[in-house]
Amino acid sequence: MHNLHLPYNDYGSTMRRRLGGRVQKLAIDAHLGCPHRNAESNKGGCTFCLGEAFTPSYCNTQHSITEQINSAIEFHTSRNRSADKYLAYFQAGTNTFADTDTLNRLYSEALAHPEIDGIIIGTRPDCISSEILDLLEDFSHNYYVAVEYGIESTSDVILRHVNRGHDYATAVQAVTATKARNIDVGAHFILGLPYETREEILAQTATINALNLDFVKFH
């Protein structure tokens, strides 16, 4: 079923059909950091990274996952954004950058909240493992689960310029492995990165389509 008013399937309408009501993502900061930015790695991080720019005011790493969810629901409700379904969106940082016991505890706390119907895990394609996918697959039997990979570009040259720390082949492997578990997979791409031409931006279209993603974000 396609949205009759848009030349593409928009995220909101698609999720409404799938989950049976208006869906609101609630950003969560699990304070897991990033393997590409921490002091031990000495890699410096991506040149474009500024986590504070997209972290909502209600995300407070001093608060528990449950407290952040409560604050997020209050935040959206006060702005007339109440929803029928809520998804805990582990957005800030790399949300698979921990041992599986820690991840299980964090994800389980979110899913134990009575208002939460599923989780979306934002992470890097070079920070996923079969053990983590096992965990997410187990959750997916009872809840909506999606993984959102920061791919940013299909060009290895551009990825090196922005010090991304992985190549495009790594992203393809991560997406393929995740989809094999019947878990929804999304990806972020940044258009207009340094040294990227308009022709290169447009040429990515077929490559991105070949990933068969369930959803995609362009920045």
Spans of model-derived segments:
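Distinct, well-ordered alpha-helical segments
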Residues: 100-108, 129-138, 199-201
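Short, surface-exposed connector motifs at secondary-structure boundaries
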Residues: 113-119, 184-187
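Active-site mouth loops of central-metabolism enzymes
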Residues: 37, 92-100, 192-199
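Acidic (Asp/Glu)-rich catalytic clusters
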Residues: 77-81, 106-114, 134-144, 176-180
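N-terminal [4Fe-4S]-dependent radical SAM core
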Residues: 1-87
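Conserved C-terminal portion of the radical SAM core fold
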Residues: 169-219
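Core AdoMet radical
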Residues: 52-72, 76-100, 115-128, 144-170, ...
